[in-house]
């Protein structure tokens, strides 16, 4: 079975979608074998709105490809179009039962998101979206996905207009598009409910899953992640990160993480540390997505702790259960906090202006981060250390 998945654009969102991707990989065989409900039987586009799935209200759009060259078949001529009527004429015992290993997934999306899923065992290959640089973006996107060949099913974890064009161009028998909802559920739950509804699943594992092996460090690591791609409002101050690192410089090996666009703030931290006699390793702009995951996963194995803003690396840490101090300011931590990481501690203030959800502080004061002191973070790190020691003992 061959599946196309359009990944979320942002690294953090892609990590949060990993549980839903696992559900697709694991249960696609049953989907191919005809375990569809009558919801999918018509040969036209569907739109299901405001369906309640537990605590989550999710909207899902399902598109049916009526391109003539599909000849009424299910997907890439790999099986019958199993509508409700067709199922009545099929003997279930004759339906092909594919294993998870036979499912091949083509991942489509941003460079960072694609790099994250390169190591997935069901990955056939990844395709980086190159349409943004094209003069006629929609036309380029349509033909880029059109030329990928035929698929049994296509899933999009994005809800933009361009994702609709992508699904329209995809040569797939069944197409499923995620739609945003305004409920307060965690983003992991939203993605998972989308897939559970699409595949008619009652249950699915909600654990995040990445396939990079954690690095083995020779000493406990204090990882600092001062960046946040969304905007400056989410960033704790470089001087604050440096103060925390100086407090623990004799206990941990200090490593600074960041992307190429975050070199300046990482270098500020490095400069403060070296001026105060503390050694550190600045990895800003020097690691691939794979190496980033391996290093963050290795921090927990080393007995270390990861201090981070609300960001993609924070979600990577959650996937590896790395002990984490997560610093929140303008965003809703209930929707994007470290998922299922019992080793994480969320630090935030309770100001009237929170959460503003802005990229830059609209008041110009940035009190949600400015008033979150380094001493508070140091105290929480020590508590987390004691908790980890008690659990291991």
Residue locations for each model-derived region?
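Catalytic machinery of carbohydrate-active enzymes
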Residues: 1-52, 58-393
């Amino acid at each position: 079975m061959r599946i196309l998945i359009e990944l979320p654009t942002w690294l953090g969102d892609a990590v949060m979608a990993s549980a839903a991707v696992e559900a697709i990989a694991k249960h696609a065989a049953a989907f191919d074998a005809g375990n569809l409900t009558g919801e999918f039987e018509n040969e036209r586009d569907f739109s299901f709105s405001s369906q309640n799935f537990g605590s989550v209200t999710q909207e899902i759009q399902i598109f049916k490809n009526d391109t003539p060259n599909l000849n009424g078949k299910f997907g890439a001529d790999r099986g019958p179009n199993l509508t409700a009527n067709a199922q009545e004429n099929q003997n279930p015992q004759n339906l092909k039962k594919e294993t998870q290993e036979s499912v091949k997934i083509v991942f489509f999306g941003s460079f960072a998101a694609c790099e994250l899923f390169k190591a997935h065992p069901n990955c056939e290959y990844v395709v980086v979206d190159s349409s943004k640089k094209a003069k006629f973006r929609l036309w380029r996107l349509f033909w880029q996905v059109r030329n990928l060949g035929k698929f049994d099913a296509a899933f999009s974890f994005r809800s933009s207009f361009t994702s609709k064009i992508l699904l329209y161009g995809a040569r797939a028998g069944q197409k499923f598009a995620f739609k945003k909802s305004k409920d307060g559920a965690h983003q992991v739950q939203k993605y998972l409910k989308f897939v559970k509804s699409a595949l008619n699943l009652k249950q699915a594992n909600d654990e995040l899953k990445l396939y990079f092996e954690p690095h083995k460090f020779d000493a406990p690591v204090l990882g600092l992640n001062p960046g946040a791609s969304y905007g400056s409002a989410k960033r704790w101050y470089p001087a604050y990160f440096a103060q925390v690192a100086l407090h623990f410089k004799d206990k941990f090996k200090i490593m600074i993480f960041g992307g190429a666009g975050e070199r300046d703030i990482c270098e500020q931290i490095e400069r403060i540390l070296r001026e105060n006699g503390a050694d550190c390793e600045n990895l800003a702009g020097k690691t691939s997505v794979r190496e980033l995951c391996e290093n963050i996963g290795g921090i927990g194995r080393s007995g270390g702790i990861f201090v981070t803003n609300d960001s993609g690396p924070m979600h990577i840490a959650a996937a590896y259960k790395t002990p984490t101090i997560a610093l929140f300011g303008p965003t809703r931590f209930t929707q994007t906090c470290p998922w299922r990481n019992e080793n994480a501690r969320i630090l935030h203030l309770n100001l009237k202006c929170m959460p503003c959800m802005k990229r830059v502080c609209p008041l110009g004061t940035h009190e949600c981060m400015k008033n979150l002191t380094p001493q508070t973070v140091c105290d929480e790190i020590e508590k987390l250390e004691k908790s980890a020691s008690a659990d291991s003992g």
